Each structure stands twice: as C-alpha cells, then as structure tokens.
UniProtKB/Swiss-Prot annotation:
The active site is at 270 (proton acceptor), 541, 653 (nucleophile). One of its GO terms (molecular function) is exo-alpha-sialidase activity. SUPFAM superfamilies: Concanavalin A-like lectins/glucanases, Sialidases. Belongs to the glycosyl hydrolase 33 family. GO terms for biological process: ganglioside catabolic process; oligosaccharide catabolic process. Residues 1-29 form the signal peptide. Keywords: Glycosidase, Hydrolase, Repeat, Signal. The gene is nanB. BNR repeats lie at residues 280-291, 462-473, 517-528, 566-577. GO terms for cellular component: cytoplasm; intracellular membrane-bounded organelle; membrane. It is an enzyme of class 3 (hydrolase). This is Sialidase B. Its EC number is 3.2.1.18.
Amino acid sequence: MNKRGLYSKLGISVVGISLLMGVPTLIHANELNYGQLSISPIFQGGSYQLNNKSIDISSLLLDKLSGESQTVVMKFKADKPNSLQALFGLSNSKAGFKNNYFSIFMRDSGEIGVEIRDAQKGINYLFSRPASLWGKHKGQAVENTLVFVSDSKDKTYTMYVNGIEVFSETVDTFLPISNINGIDKATLGAVNREGKEHYLAKGSIDEISLFNKAISDQEVSTIPLSNPFQLIFQSGDSTQANYFRIPTLYTLSSGRVLSSIDARYGGTHDSKSKINIATSYSDDNGKTWSEPIFAMKFNDYEEQLVYWPRDNKLKNSQISGSASFIDSSIVEDKKSGKTILLADVMPAGIGNNNANKADSGFKEINGHYYLKLKKNGDNDFRYTVRENGVVYNETTNKPTNYTINDKYEVLEGGKSLTVEQYSVDFDSGSLRERHNGKQVPMNVFYKDSLFKVTPTNYIAMTTSQNRGESWEQFKLLPPFLGEKHNGTYLCPGQGLALKSSNRLIFATYTSGELTYLISDDSGQTWKKSSASIPFKNATAEAQMVELRDGVIRTFFRTTTGKIAYMTSRDSGETWSKVSYIDGIQQTSYGTQVSAIKYSQLIDGKEAVILSTPNSRSGRKGGQLVVGLVNKEDDSIDWKYHYDIDLPSYGYAYSAITELPNHHIGVLFEKYDSWSRNELHLSNVVQYIDLEINDLTK
C-alpha cells in the first residue's frame, strides 16, 4: 500500500473590512521547537494564560521588529473562547489612532483571521477563513498551531493552521505589519486601541515566536503539529481535487477500512459540477491510508486543482457543462466477497434542481428497460441502447451503425468517436469553460456527444474484486419507479448486508418515500421496497442498522428538526410508520445522519451509535450518540452524547465505522456545509479515531 504523510497545503481567502483590538503584561522566553527554520526568532515565549486580560510584550518585541517581512508562529488553545477575540496585536495606542493596528483574531465558530489597518495610509484589510480551528478533542483543549506569514516580496498575507494553508491573499498595496504608523504596543490576548483593551481573549498561548522574515512553505511544513485529525483525502492529492464532500467509511470482513468521497472540482457545489468518486483504504486500523483512486469518473472536464472564489460576486459560479457523480454508498457482499459501490450519476449540466422529474431515461420494451438516446439535431429521443450495446433507431425499428460500449462511450462502425475535453478558469471576473485541445472518448453523458442520455438523474453501480484496490466500469441500475419518473436519489454512507442471509440493501429517497433497493444475488438484480414518509420535498438521506436477524432500523434526515426512524421486521420487505428521536436536534432543513450497530456490549446491552450535528441553528455541534437497545421491544435508550468538538464548531455530513480494534473511526465535514459563508473550504473533511470509553464517560 502506498502510505503517505498527512501534511497538506491549501489556499482559500475571504476579503473584508475591519474588526479588532487589545492590552498588556509580562513573559519569559523558552527554548521552543519550531522545526528546521533557517533563522532565529526575534522573540519567543510561553506559556501564557489568557483570561480576559491582555499581556503586554511591547518592551520585549517592538525594538527588535524591523524589515518588511515577518512571520508569527503560535501554539494556542481556546476551548471556551469569547465570540470574537484577539490572540496577538500590534497597535498605535494613542488617541486618534484607533484604526492603526495589526491583529490575529479568532471567533467561537472556529474562524481564524487577520486585520491589517493604517488609517493614514488608507489600508484596511481583513482576511479570514471559517472552520479552521479545533477547540477540544476527547474532552481536552486542542493545541492549534498557527503560522502567519507577511511577505513583502510577493505582497501576500498567508495563514496556516494545523499544517493547512487556510488563506493566502495577494494585494496591490502591501503594508508590512512592522510599518503600521505609530506602533507602540504589542499584546497577547487583546489589541490596545486608544489605550483600551479590545477583543479580550480566553484560552492559552503555549508558545509564540516572531521572525523578521517570511518563512517558506517548506519551512512551515517542518513545524511540529499536535493535530487530533488526519486527512484521508486532501487538496492536491492524486485526485487533483481541491474540495471534498460526502464521506463514507466501511469496514470490510478482511479488516480493511474503505472510504469513498465526492472529489469536487467546481468548489464545494453539488451537481451540476465536475465531481468524481474517489476511494482510499487502510489496513492498520485507520493509522495510514492509501493514495486515493477513482471508483467513478468522467473525462469530459479536466481534473484541475482550482481555487474557487469565496467572494459574494463569484462564489455561486458553477461548472455548467460537466457530467458528474455524487453521493456514494458502500457495502460488502459476503457471498461473492466483492465490494459494491453505488452513486448518483448526472449527465452534463444536470443536478438535483434541474433533473427531469418525469422521465427515467429508459424505455420499457417487452418487460426490459433500455437506455434512451437523443441524436444531435433531433427534437426527441428516437434511439435506445439494446443488447450488445447496439444503438437502435426506434423510428425505423432497425439497428444503426453505432454502438455504446461498457463505458457508455460512442462507437461508429466499431471505431471510437471523440470529443474535445474542457478546462475551467476564472478570467476577467467570470468563470470560463473552454476546450483545452485534448481529445477524449465520446460518452453519452457528455454535452458534446453525438448521442445524449435524458437529462435526469441515474444510479450507477461499480464493484471491486480486490477490496477497493481497483474498480470495474460502472453500470446503470434500471428505473424502479417506472418510465415516467426520474430515478431515486441514493442515501450516501453504507449499504446494509444482512447477517443471516445474502440480502443487500441500499436506501434511496424520492418525494414522499424511502425506496429501498434490495438484491439477493450479489447485486446482479435489484428490486424495490417502498416506505412512505410524511415529507414531500425532504432530502431524506437514510442509514440502516440490523438490530437483530431481519430487524432493520432506519434513521433519516427530515424537515422537522428531528431525526426520524422506521423499522422493518421482515428483512426490508415492509416498514413501520415513521417515529422520531427525542433529545437530538437538527435544523429545519436537516443533515445526513450516520449510524452503525456496535459489535460489543455497552453497559451489558447491544448498542447503536449515531453521528449527527445536534443543533437547531446550523450544521454544528457534532455528536456521537450511543443508544442502548432494549431487546423486549427494540426501543433504544440514547444514553451517551459525545461532543466531537465545541457546540459552535461546524459538523455536517459524516461517516462512522467500527474499526477492527473496536475503536470508532469518524470521517466528517468539519464545517457548516449549508452556510453560504462556508462554501469552498479545502481540507475540512477530517478523520479521527475514538475509543468506546471516550464515548461513554
């Protein structure tokens, strides 16, 4: 297995206006370990307790501050932060100069940022990124490692947190932080503005060093970290994606832990966009992970490491012409030993919002479903893909000279046809999608194809015979709701393999129902079982656990602010009415929930573990909730609530699995993926390892 390190680099910025300030005390310099840096700091010290009173380091720092480039390296903890607080400040404290200061600040939402202000020079910069910090892990305050680089040569201000570049902003008018007019105060835990402390902080600064130099990316990478997390998928890895969403985890019978995810190239936007499905695996209980590969991908658009704009003008830009995959789910078939992965498939330019809801994309002929195609220049779908991939003309009732191969590529007379690939960039303030000169095989899902599928959503299946080391070509599943209804939407996460039979089940949803896809022959054929739900427009993403033989409990997202559940007592054939869990809150739009049945007893009872945000005000406050199962009636007592991080820190889609050593692996979106302010964040899908004792304290 190709093992790799987890230091990563990313770049995202938010430009704004103003905000901050603070005050003074004393310090002692320690010998601190900051990796293989090429120069010595002009100041270093620690540790400092911040309790709503600033610490003045002016006499120790200001006379040494010189030159036009600086670096600040800081290790700090803040598990009970104020809503807005300054960690470090340089300022002109005299009357009339309240807007002359530099500040490194944080918010209690996990945002980190800087302000650089000089009223006389007309400089007013604010750069920040939300969802950048950790507050606590396993009940203890987390030490965050912050590096801020002010580089006069490149005219950039760059922030790294916990080994991740969270923003790098280039400006036309660069102001060195050392050249702010009239600096006379250097403070920890506040900024001194006109003699008053502003943005007081709570927490601790364990170590801090300042350098009269802009240190390099390579030097930053040598600074030791105390991260509680890993990155399985990261910006710039083998996927060449800058963004990832919708994680899954699944522990195979061999002990290998498999993960899949959306590798997103057009920011964090859902389809329509360019999105592939990537996978990685671990053979050592999640300690190290293989280099990602693709389980499903299209080639109509190039895999590009693009930094999507986060400003209000451009952040809503979406790739409009690419085909995509989205929302994967995994199950292992114990009979054949193969791994099955399903995902939604979207043709070029199609997403949930604009998919044709009244067309399956298939035509039924003599009890068989055939994929429909429209030829360029036609007004309707006059062709179908028949046996052996032959493209059949429905008007003449004759085969054509065209065929579709197992990759859904178009051939004429046995010869592959091609289209020109697209690349994207931002030019003159707008998104540009342009041909790049590379020819790729023509595919019926591509916008430039001679033949195109119906612009609706589909479900695809791929399998792996070697536990995720490689994947076969995907195949479309047939429609389950008839010709005149679009496909159901896959519930991302895990499928369910029943213990005492060969049955496999995946949960999907459509308007007003959960539609369970069931296979009893290792995924060769599928049937459906429908269960009505009292929501017409809910994204009812569901996950299943088998409480005991043939008894399945499904937990799912709703529009009620609660997690719903239903039960089947006949291996998924029929389902109970919907009930709701008390004691766990979600927003009115809901969030995906992840669930597993734990293999060991907890407090002498069988147990279920849920992963969910527990908040009415956003996708935040992530918890693992342990429920103890009462055998008499299959009711569940939700006894233990474990906080992933602070209640105000983001937690959106998640995946959990029981590792071979009985720990719990958690891969989750550590940000509020619903918030328009938190679009297009890189390296926020993070993996942690928890022991069951952590959850039940």
